[in-house]
Amino acid sequence: MVHLTDAEKSAVSCLWAKVNPDEVGGEALGRLLVVYPWTQRYFDSFGDLSSASAIMGNPKVKAHGKKVITAFNEGLKNLDNLKGTFASLSELHCDKLHVDPENFRLLGNAIVIVLGHHLGKDFTPAAQAAFQKVVAGVATALAHKYH
């Protein structure tokens, strides 16, 4: 559960409406793979991840990034029940994929960076603070199965 003020909820909702999931998801996942190269081990089937330009232009990275942002969007619709919303994804990433749960926090931070880039001056410090709360809540929910 994420506790947002009414102003934070409004900021998140208004700004999220401006987001293009095709762009933001792939860019955020791409940044994760470039900035934290050890995360690439979970994406062996994605082909060429040999350089930043290869990663950022990789269609499989973009497609999976869109899936990530689509799931994130579901979380935004269910801020009062993030653990329930992400229960099956938490189980998948824990039991089958064996993803280090710290990577969820890193990806959340990458999403915030990309949102700042795409939203420009509209992404105020207050808006960033609200989104940081959201991505922290999502990361905690995704890591729930690990506890």
Swiss-Prot record:
Record InterPro entries: Globin, Globin-like_sf, Globin/Proto, Hemoglobin_b, Hemoglobin_oxygen_transport
Phosphoserine PTM positions: S45, S51, S53
UniProt domain Globin: residue ranges: 3-147
Cross-referenced SUPFAM superfamilies: Globin-like
Modified residues (N6-succinyllysine): K18, K60
Entry-annotated residues carrying Phosphotyrosine: Y42
Phosphothreonine sites (modified residues): T124
GO cellular-component term (any): hemoglobin complex
Residue positions binding heme b: H64, H93
Location of Asymmetric dimethylarginine modifications: R105
Any one GO molecular-function label of the UniProt entry: metal ion binding
An example Gene Ontology biological process: oxygen transport
Tissue: Red blood cells.
CDD domains: Hb-beta-like (cd08925)
Annotated keywords: Acetylation, Heme, Iron, Metal-binding, Methylation, Oxygen transport, Phosphoprotein, Transport
Family statement drawn from the similarity comment of this UniProt entry: Belongs to the globin family.
Miscellaneous notes: The D-minor sequence is shown. See also the entry for the beta D-major chain and the S allele.
Subunit: Heterotetramer of two alpha chains and two beta chains.
Biological role: Involved in oxygen transport from the lung to the various peripheral tissues.
Protein name: Hemoglobin subunit beta-2
Species name: Mus musculus
Taxonomic lineage of the native organism: Eukaryota, Metazoa, Chordata, Craniata, Vertebrata
